[in-house]
């Protein structure tokens, strides 16, 4: 089809016919690049049987969106097929894969959550694109609305329009979003108190839980029977009010 169109154009320009020497046309076909949201070679947790340890773990934590997570029987082996990371495959084990995706759904990294109760390292974060922030849920939010920021991917599934930081060094300043920071309910943690204070100084809204709430994070609050969405919305503060609430809440 392209060749026929080319010949027709040359004919119109008088550049074809007997005695005419015309160079053969060159067509520059670029190899198409297709984005994918599929996690290669892994099974979504939603497709596992009810008794499977990975599915049982998430369901016991009341996480309903099982399609968002995958089961990986050999984490080191699978990771090395995505990006050479581990020098040895010894002591390989199963983990739940938590994909980190951009707004278009393309995976740029992932976390592996151990299924072993006494694992020394519960979460391992692997970045396939080091230019991206260690953030979970960018594909799940509406950036035109307030975006809640939680401390863990599982916590983000208990409130609407939420992302999660997958590391202590996450910088969200590159995003022009209206953030509401939802740190863990740990008033004796100097680190968390400092993070809440910094968010207030930068003009962000923060969530400061009432003293009646004893659970540490959103997942625990859901397991305890709290309406997490209402709890978060009714305890969101900013400015001077946030600073006063922080002073009342902290224990350090």
Name the predicted role of every residue range.
Residues 1-13, 68-83, 88-93, 222-251:
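Short, small/acidic-rich helices and loops at N termini and domain boundaries
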Residues 1-75, 117-122, 197:
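Non-catalytic accessory segments of DNA primases and related replication-initiation nucleases
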Residues 175-180, 217-230:
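Short, surface-exposed amphipathic charged segments that create phosphate/polyanion-binding patches used
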Residues 183-185, 195, 236:
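Conserved catalytic-core subdomain
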């Amino acid at each position: 089809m392209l060749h026929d169109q080319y010949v027709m154009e040359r004919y119109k320009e008088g550049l074809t016919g007997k005695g005419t020497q015309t160079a053969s046309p060159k067509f520059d076909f670029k190899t198409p690049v297709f984005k994918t949201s599929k996690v290669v070679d892994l099974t979504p947790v939603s497709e596992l049987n009810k008794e499977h340890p990975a599915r049982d773990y998430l369901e016991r934590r009341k996480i309903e969106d099982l399609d968002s997570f995958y089961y990986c029987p050999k984490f080191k082996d699978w990771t090395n097929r995505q990006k050479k990371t581990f020098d040895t495959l010894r002591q390989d084990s199963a983990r739940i894969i938590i994909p980190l995706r951009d707004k278009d759904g393309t995976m740029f990294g992932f976390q592996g959550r151990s299924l072993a109760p006494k694992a020394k390292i519960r979460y391992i974060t692997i970045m396939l694109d080091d230019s991206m922030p260690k953030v979970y849920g960018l594909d799940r939010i509406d950036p035109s609305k307030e975006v809640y920021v939680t401390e863990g991917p599982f916590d983000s599934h208990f409130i609407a329009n939420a992302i999660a930081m997958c590391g202590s060094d996450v910088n969200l300043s590159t995003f022009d979003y209206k953030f509401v920071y939802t740190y863990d309910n740990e008033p004796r943690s100097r680190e968390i108190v400092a993070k809440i204070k910094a968010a207030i100084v930068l003009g962000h809204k923060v969530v400061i839980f009432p003293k009646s709430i004893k659970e540490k994070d959103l997942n625990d609050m859901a397991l305890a029977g709290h309406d997490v969405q209402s709890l978060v919305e009714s305890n969101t503060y900013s400015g001077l009010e946030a600073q006063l609430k922080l002073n009342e809440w902290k224990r350090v």
